[in-house]
Protein backbone atom coordinates (compact mmCIF):
# COMPACT_ATOMS: atom_id res chain seq x y z
CA UNK A 1 0.00 0.00 0.00
CA UNK A 2 1.37 3.41 -0.98
CA UNK A 3 1.34 6.47 1.27
CA UNK A 4 -1.54 8.11 -0.63
CA UNK A 5 -3.52 4.86 -0.31
CA UNK A 6 -2.81 4.71 3.43
CA UNK A 7 -3.89 8.33 3.82
CA UNK A 8 -7.06 7.69 1.85
CA UNK A 9 -7.79 4.60 3.96
CA UNK A 10 -7.26 6.58 7.17
CA UNK A 11 -9.67 9.30 6.02
CA UNK A 12 -12.26 6.69 5.01
CA UNK A 13 -12.02 4.99 8.42
CA UNK A 14 -12.40 8.33 10.22
CA UNK A 15 -15.43 9.22 8.09
CA UNK A 16 -17.05 5.84 8.86
CA UNK A 17 -16.57 6.40 12.61
CA UNK A 18 -18.06 9.89 12.34
CA UNK A 19 -21.00 8.72 10.24
CA UNK A 20 -21.87 5.53 12.12
CA UNK A 21 -21.14 6.75 15.65
CA UNK A 22 -22.58 4.14 18.06
CA UNK A 23 -24.65 2.47 15.35
CA UNK A 24 -26.99 3.51 12.57
CA UNK A 25 -30.00 1.97 14.31
CA UNK A 26 -29.39 4.07 17.43
CA UNK A 27 -29.15 7.25 15.37
CA UNK A 28 -32.38 6.40 13.51
CA UNK A 29 -34.14 5.78 16.84
CA UNK A 30 -32.86 9.11 18.20
CA UNK A 31 -34.18 10.95 15.15
CA UNK A 32 -37.55 9.15 15.41
CA UNK A 33 -37.80 10.37 19.01
CA UNK A 34 -37.01 13.93 17.92
CA UNK A 35 -33.46 13.94 19.31
CA UNK A 36 -30.29 15.00 17.55
CA UNK A 37 -26.84 13.48 17.84
CA UNK A 38 -24.06 15.35 19.58
CA UNK A 39 -22.37 15.71 16.18
CA UNK A 40 -25.47 17.49 14.89
CA UNK A 41 -25.49 19.79 17.94
CA UNK A 42 -21.80 20.61 17.38
CA UNK A 43 -22.19 21.14 13.62
CA UNK A 44 -25.19 23.44 14.11
CA UNK A 45 -23.44 25.41 16.86
CA UNK A 46 -20.16 26.04 15.03
CA UNK A 47 -19.53 27.99 11.86
CA UNK A 48 -19.88 25.65 8.89
CA UNK A 49 -16.78 23.59 8.10
CA UNK A 50 -14.69 24.78 11.06
CA UNK A 51 -14.87 21.73 13.36
CA UNK A 52 -11.50 20.01 13.87
CA UNK A 53 -12.07 16.89 15.92
CA UNK A 54 -9.51 15.25 18.16
CA UNK A 55 -9.51 11.63 19.25
CA UNK A 56 -11.69 10.24 16.46
CA UNK A 57 -9.97 6.87 16.71
CA UNK A 58 -10.05 6.66 20.50
CA UNK A 59 -11.98 3.80 22.10
CA UNK A 60 -12.38 2.06 25.42
CA UNK A 61 -9.33 0.63 27.16
CA UNK A 62 -11.40 -2.45 28.00
CA UNK A 63 -10.75 -5.07 25.32
CA UNK A 64 -14.33 -6.37 25.39
CA UNK A 65 -15.67 -2.88 24.59
CA UNK A 66 -13.19 -1.71 21.96
CA UNK A 67 -15.25 -2.71 18.94
CA UNK A 68 -18.37 -0.79 20.00
CA UNK A 69 -17.01 2.37 21.65
CA UNK A 70 -16.05 4.76 18.84
CA UNK A 71 -14.60 7.94 20.33
CA UNK A 72 -15.18 6.28 23.72
CA UNK A 73 -18.51 8.06 24.00
CA UNK A 74 -17.07 11.57 23.74
CA UNK A 75 -16.75 13.87 20.74
CA UNK A 76 -14.75 17.06 20.86
CA UNK A 77 -12.42 19.46 19.16
CA UNK A 78 -12.05 23.05 18.13
CA UNK A 79 -13.98 25.28 15.76
CA UNK A 80 -15.30 28.79 15.33
CA UNK A 81 -18.45 30.64 16.37
CA UNK A 82 -18.90 33.87 14.41
CA UNK A 83 -15.26 33.54 13.32
CA UNK A 84 -14.02 33.31 16.92
CA UNK A 85 -12.24 30.16 18.16
CA UNK A 86 -13.97 27.90 20.66
CA UNK A 87 -13.43 24.43 22.13
CA UNK A 88 -16.47 22.18 22.02
CA UNK A 89 -17.19 18.66 23.20
CA UNK A 90 -20.12 16.48 24.11
CA UNK A 91 -21.37 13.12 25.22
CA UNK A 92 -22.22 10.72 22.40
CA UNK A 93 -25.28 8.96 23.78
CA UNK A 94 -25.21 6.50 20.87
CA UNK A 95 -22.12 4.96 22.55
CA UNK A 96 -22.99 3.44 25.92
CA UNK A 97 -25.28 6.43 26.66
CA UNK A 98 -22.27 8.78 26.54
CA UNK A 99 -20.99 7.34 29.79
CA UNK A 100 -17.60 8.48 31.06
CA UNK A 101 -14.54 6.29 31.10
CA UNK A 102 -10.79 6.64 31.22
CA UNK A 103 -10.13 7.39 27.54
CA UNK A 104 -13.10 9.77 27.20
CA UNK A 105 -12.02 11.60 30.35
CA UNK A 106 -8.48 11.92 29.03
CA UNK A 107 -9.84 13.36 25.80
CA UNK A 108 -11.89 15.88 27.79
CA UNK A 109 -8.81 16.76 29.84
CA UNK A 110 -6.77 17.36 26.70
CA UNK A 111 -9.46 19.68 25.32
CA UNK A 112 -9.55 21.65 28.57
CA UNK A 113 -5.76 21.99 28.55
CA UNK A 114 -5.68 23.23 24.96
CA UNK A 115 -8.57 25.61 25.49
CA UNK A 116 -7.02 27.14 28.59
CA UNK A 117 -3.63 27.43 26.88
CA UNK A 118 -5.25 29.25 23.95
CA UNK A 119 -7.50 31.35 26.20
CA UNK A 120 -10.68 30.37 24.38
CA UNK A 121 -14.13 29.40 25.69
CA UNK A 122 -15.25 25.82 26.27
CA UNK A 123 -18.75 24.61 25.38
CA UNK A 124 -20.00 21.21 26.57
CA UNK A 125 -23.07 19.46 25.18
CA UNK A 126 -23.82 17.23 28.15
CA UNK A 127 -26.16 14.26 28.13
CA UNK A 128 -24.21 11.49 29.81
CA UNK A 129 -25.33 8.22 31.31
CA UNK A 130 -22.83 8.70 34.16
CA UNK A 131 -19.60 6.78 34.68
CA UNK A 132 -18.89 3.27 33.44
CA UNK A 133 -18.50 1.31 36.65
CA UNK A 134 -15.99 -1.26 35.28
CA UNK A 135 -13.81 1.58 34.01
CA UNK A 136 -13.69 3.49 37.27
CA UNK A 137 -12.87 0.44 39.38
CA UNK A 138 -9.23 -0.19 40.28
CA UNK A 139 -6.44 2.25 40.93
CA UNK A 140 -6.19 3.67 37.42
CA UNK A 141 -9.94 4.15 37.03
CA UNK A 142 -10.43 5.74 40.42
CA UNK A 143 -7.65 8.25 39.83
CA UNK A 144 -8.97 9.49 36.47
CA UNK A 145 -12.46 11.03 36.91
CA UNK A 146 -11.72 12.88 40.15
CA UNK A 147 -8.43 14.07 38.76
CA UNK A 148 -10.19 15.88 35.95
CA UNK A 149 -12.56 17.81 38.19
CA UNK A 150 -9.72 18.82 40.51
CA UNK A 151 -7.64 19.86 37.50
CA UNK A 152 -10.49 22.00 36.18
CA UNK A 153 -10.83 23.82 39.49
CA UNK A 154 -7.11 24.48 39.80
CA UNK A 155 -6.68 25.53 36.18
CA UNK A 156 -9.39 28.15 36.15
CA UNK A 157 -8.95 29.33 39.73
CA UNK A 158 -12.35 28.00 40.71
CA UNK A 159 -13.29 27.45 44.33
CA UNK A 160 -16.10 25.09 45.23
CA UNK A 161 -18.54 26.09 47.97
CA UNK A 162 -17.76 24.37 51.27
Label every PLM stretch briefly.
Residues 1-162:
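Terminal-region recognition feature
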Amino acid sequence: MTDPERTSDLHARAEKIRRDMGGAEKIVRMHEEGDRTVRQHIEEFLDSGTFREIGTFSRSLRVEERDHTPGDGKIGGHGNVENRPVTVFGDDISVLRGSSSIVGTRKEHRLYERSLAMGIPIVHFGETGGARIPDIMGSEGISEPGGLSNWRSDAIGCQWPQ
